[in-house]
Amino acid sequence: MKPKIYLDNCCYNRPYDDQSQIRINLESQAKLFIQKLISFETLELVTSVMSYYENSRNPDKKHREAISAFMKKHETMCVTENDTIWNIQGTIVSTGIKEADAFHLASAIFANCDCFITTDDRILKYRTESIRIINPIQFIIEMR
């Protein structure tokens, strides 16, 4: 069975960030490698309505369209709003995670993803037994 992953919007946008910082550059390379694995169908990609909503707010049209096209082409599931997700989100928000980030996490948990991949340090500090939260670099290292 292929690992099922959820990439948050920080990951999708990481290759468009300033690559002069080593951490950003390494995270970008790891994220692009993850995209290749998704394209080769080695990994299963889960998205959500929040993924599309946040991406629609990206001011760079070229980046917005590229990200949207990748998600549409490769997603195996797009999680939509439902009471279970709202309940999970509420629990996560109560720990101090922002609402949009909590919706992403709740969507990944609802879809039974193996990993939630993010570059956001605040989310990386969040702990739950429901899903593994991991940086793209660490994800690649552990896949070996």
Where in this protein do the model-derived segments appear?
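Conserved beta-strand segments of alpha/beta enzyme cores
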Residues: 44, 75-77, 132
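Alpha-helix capping/helix-boundary segments
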Residues: 11, 51, 85, 104, ...
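Mid-chain, well-packed structural core segment of small domains
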Residues: 88, 96-98, 103
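Short, well-structured N-terminal submotif of metal-dependent ribonuclease cores
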Residues: 1-47, 57-65, 137, 141-144
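Short beta-strand scaffold positions
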Residues: 7, 80, 99-102, 118
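Acidic catalytic patch
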Residues: 50-54, 71-94
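Acidic, PIN/NYN-like endoribonuclease modules and their adjacent C-terminal/linker elements
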Residues: 1-4, 18-28, 94, 106-144
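Short, aromatic/basic amphipathic alpha-helical patches
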Residues: 61-69, 128-130
